[in-house]
Every structure is written in C-alpha cells, then in structure tokens.
C-alpha cells in the first residue's frame, strides 16, 4: 500500500523508505517554533537537559505575539526572559516587537517554512504551514524544549482523510467558509489525530491565503495536520518569499485513507460557527438577525492582506453601526504597512474601525478587545469556546472577513450580499 503526502514527508525525515499509520518514528526537524506564552516553559525544561546550546541557531523561531506589545508587567517579564535566552543562545529568528507579527502569518512571510519541511510549534495552530505543502503540527512546551536541544522529535504516523474539493465557490465563499463547513460536517473530533489532505480542481480557485486559513483550522476538527499539494500558486508564493530549497512530495495513487469526502464548493454558502464549538455551524441564511456588540477582523486565521482588502471593500464609504466596536488587526508589520500604502487603513478608520498593531490579542482573551458578560462578537478567529475572548457568559461567532465586516455595519450577523 502506498503513502499519503504526509506519510511521505515523515518517512523522508525519519530516514525510512516507508511508514504506515500508527507507526512510532523519530524525525529530524526543519524548524522549531515558540511564542511568548509557551517558550518560557520550554526554556525551563531546556535548562534541565544539561545542554548549553540549541541544535541549530537558524532553525528555531521565537515570536512574542500573544500579549505583545506587552500588555502588563507579567507579559513584559515573560518576553524579557525569552529575549535573554534567545540572545544567550544566539537564536537568529527572534522577532522583536518592531518586526514581529502573529506567528503563523509571519513565518511564511519570512520564508522560514517551505514545501516538504517538518515543523513543530508550541502553539496548536502550527498546522497552518500545511498550506505550503509542509508537515507542521502543534506540540507542548516540553517537546519544544527537546526539539530545541536535539533537532528531533517523535510522532505516531497519522492516518488520513482525503477531501476532494470540486468546482468554483460562490462570490462570498472563502477558505474560512469552506473549513467551517468541513468542521461542521465532521465535528470537532472528526479528524482526531488524522491528516486532513485537501485535493481536487477546487484548489484552482483557492488563493494561498484561503489555504492558510483552512490549514490553520485543521486542529479545530482534531486534525494532526492539514496539508495541500504543491501547485503553481504554492511555487509562486515560495519564490516570492524565500531563497530556501524546497521539496515536493505527492501522495501515491494507492495511498490508503480512512475516508474520502467530496465537497462541491459551488453549493456552499457563507458559514458562521455559533457558540461554543467550531462545529456548531449554520449557513448565513440561518444565522442572521443575531445582535452583536463587537467585530474582530484579524488573527492567524484571517489577518492577511486579502482579508483586509475584503473588509475594506465592504466598509469603505460606510459607517460601522453606532455602538458596535470594530477591531482590525493586521497579521504582521509588513501586512500593516501594505494596508497603509494601499489606503486600506485610512478607509477602515474613516468607517469607524480601530486598527491595532499585530497581536493575537483578543483571540485568546488576552487584550485589545476583551468581551464583558453577555456581550457577543463576530470574529474571524478560530475558536469560540466558553470564555475564549473574555467573560464566560460572552459569546463568539466565527465567520469570514466578509461576514464580519457586513455585520459591523448592521450590528447583527449579516450576509455580505445584503450590504
């Protein structure tokens, strides 16, 4: 029996001719990632190993993004601790506040991840880089520490679900709507410890930003990773962002999948995830008329330039409804600057939105948009668990930038076609 795309990447990095689902393997790592929340714990564990250097100064990336710019003294102390460790170890890819971004927007932009890589990160949404044809997955701080010390980690080889995406999506259907539809269909544990492998002619209509969004949310279906085949769009992106060499892996024709699911993208509608799980989805025609207090457009899921362009296209020349807070967070400094140069920021501010420096911020209930008791938020983020963005009696509705921007104008969940 042949191997899936994920299995081929893992076999190569384990120095094996082949692997099969359920097999325990040790692999060599191309990149180890941490942030301001998870890295301090990893540093503490690293110090217990009795080693005095990291395995490779250029293959570790540390991105303070959750509570930065520092929201309080505790956050400042954590970042200081991480900064001092990075300086001591000579880690080349520590991103200070002036050059930082939300980690999963920043690393592809900086060209640190390429097709064929194996990447681990002490953040659950590390699966984002599957959009580039890499195997990437979230791990805990202890595994991050071991990865920094040895350049290796172990995996149980995942089985896979193949998603065959067909046809062209309708006007307002984005990668966010597609992945919400999939999560709603299979459930938050529907791909538990499985590779979600996306194929089909529908990929021709999905931008790289759409793919980043979809791979990012693979974990919300329980997936070990989400991954896309490398095509012309991938290669164009890689050529623009990196000088690193990449390697293309393709699934064998006789690869074995636990399930094969076909999805006709032309039949999908804008989709909203209701509280308090990402799989509690409804199409926009069954989701409207829910009154809201706040809108957040940003995050590692939807903070890229195309997302801001979509929001601008809906909000330009209009006004955010009085009493509604509309918070826009570009994913990186580069995206922020590009949005400034394109006049996007000006149009958003004139519409009544507030624009933040890059940060995870409100997504995890950290800062820059926390919800009070009883408040509701339409957010382009990736999780809507109880208390995720603030008070345990607040509510988060996950949606695309188009739905979020339209909702900011009306003060209720709104189909972008209607504004």
From Swiss-Prot:
Pathway: Amino-acid biosynthesis; L-leucine biosynthesis; L-leucine from 3-methyl-2-oxobutanoate: step 2/4. Gene3D superfamilies: Aconitase, domain 3. PROSITE patterns: ACONITASE_1, ACONITASE_2. It is an enzyme of class 4 (lyase). Its EC number is 4.2.1.33. It catalyses: (2R,3S)-3-isopropylmalate = (2S)-2-isopropylmalate. This is 3-isopropylmalate dehydratase large subunit. The lineage of its organism: Bacteria, Bacillati, Bacillota, Clostridia, Eubacteriales. The gene is leuC.
């Amino acid at each position: 029996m042949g191997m899936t795309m994920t299995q081929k990447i893992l076999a190569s990095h384990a120095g094996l001719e082949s692997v099969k689902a359920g097999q325990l393997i040790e692999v060599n790592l191309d990149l180890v990632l941490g942030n301001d929340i998870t890295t301090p714990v990893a540093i503490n564990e690293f110090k217990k190993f009795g080693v005095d250097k990291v395995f490779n100064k250029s293959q570790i990336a540390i991105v303070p993004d959750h509570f930065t710019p520092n929201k309080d003294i505790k956050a400042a102390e954590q970042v200081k601790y991480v900064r001092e460790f990075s300086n001591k170890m000579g880690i080349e890819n520590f991103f200070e506040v002036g050059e930082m971004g939300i980690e999963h927007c920043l690393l592809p932009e900086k060209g640190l991840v390429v097709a064929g890589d194996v990447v681990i990160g002490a953040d659950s949404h590390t699966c984002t880089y599957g959009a580039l044809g890499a195997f990437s997955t979230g791990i805990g701080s202890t595994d991050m520490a071991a990865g920094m010390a040895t350049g290796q980690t172990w995996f149980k080889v995942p089985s896979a679900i193949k998603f065959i995406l067909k046809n062209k999506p309708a006007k307002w259907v984005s990668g966010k709507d597609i992945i919400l539809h999939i999560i709603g269909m299979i459930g938050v544990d529907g791909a538990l410890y499985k590779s979600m492998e996306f194929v089909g002619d529908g990929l021709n209509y999905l931008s790289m930003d759409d793919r980043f969004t979809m791979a990012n949310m693979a974990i919300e279906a329980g997936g070990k990773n989400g991954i896309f085949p490398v095509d012309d769009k991938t290669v164009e992106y890689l050529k623009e962002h990196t000088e690193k060499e990449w390697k293309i892996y393709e699934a064998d024709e006789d690869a074995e999948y636990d399930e094969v699911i076909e999805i006709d993208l032309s039949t999908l509608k804008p989709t909203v995830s209701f509280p308090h799980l990402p799989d509690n989805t409804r199409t926009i025609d069954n989701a409207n008329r829910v009154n809201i207090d706040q809108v957040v457009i940003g995050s590692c899921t939807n903070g890229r330039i195309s997302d801001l362009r979509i929001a601008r296209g809906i909000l330009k020349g209009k006004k955010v409804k009085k009493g509604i807070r509309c918070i826009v967070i570009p994913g990186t400094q580069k995206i922020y600057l590009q949005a400034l140069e394109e006049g996007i920021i000006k149009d958003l501010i004139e519409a009544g939105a507030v624009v933040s420096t890059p940060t995870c911020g409100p997504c995890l209930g950290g800062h820059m948009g926390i919800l009070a008791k009883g408040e509701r938020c339409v957010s382009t983020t990736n999780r809507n668990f109880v208390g995720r963005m603030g008070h345990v009696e607040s509510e988060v509705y996950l949606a695309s930038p188009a739905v979020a921007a339209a909702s900011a104008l009306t003060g209720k969940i709104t189909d972008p076609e209607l504004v």
